[in-house]
């Protein structure tokens, strides 16, 4: 995942090149989308049916890459979440700002009773 949101791009430029402070979030969260969130944060995030963003723990970066150091598991869906085609990393458990986003390698339809999981090391963020 290397697609940064407009929000994060501007925050990093301001912090690195303009000496404007940026406060990193204490926790970041994975959000699931049925449409592309885009750099402008305009996608359709899943809602309802027991959906909630899940916190992510990342390991130390190496050569500009970091991966999740713990599995990410969403609650069991109590109804359809639709077809998940994109994920985003956000700075709050609700609302907040989109930081990174990407399309999944393969979309996944979540029906009643399904659980969406991402294994350790399967979510990566790359700055290049």
What are these regions (language model features)?
Residues 1-87, 91-128:
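Small cysteine-rich, disulfide-bonded extracellular modules of the LU/uPAR three-finger superfamily
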């Amino acid at each position: 995942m290397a697609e940064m949101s407009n929000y994060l791009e501007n925050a990093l430029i301001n912090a690195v090149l303009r000496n404007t402070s940026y406060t990193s979030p204490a926790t970041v969260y994975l959000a699931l989308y049925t449409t592309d969130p885009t750099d402008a944060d305009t996608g359709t995030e899943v809602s309802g049916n027991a959906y909630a963003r899940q916190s992510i723990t990342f390991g130390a970066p190496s050569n500009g890459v970091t991966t999740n150091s713990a599995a990410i598991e969403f609650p069991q869906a109590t109804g359809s979440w639709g077809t998940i085609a994109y994920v985003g990393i956000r700075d709050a458990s609700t609302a907040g700002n989109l930081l990174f986003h990407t399309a999944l390698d393969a979309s996944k339809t979540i029906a009643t009773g399904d659980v969406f999981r991402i294994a350790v090391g399967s979510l990566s963020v790359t700055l290049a």
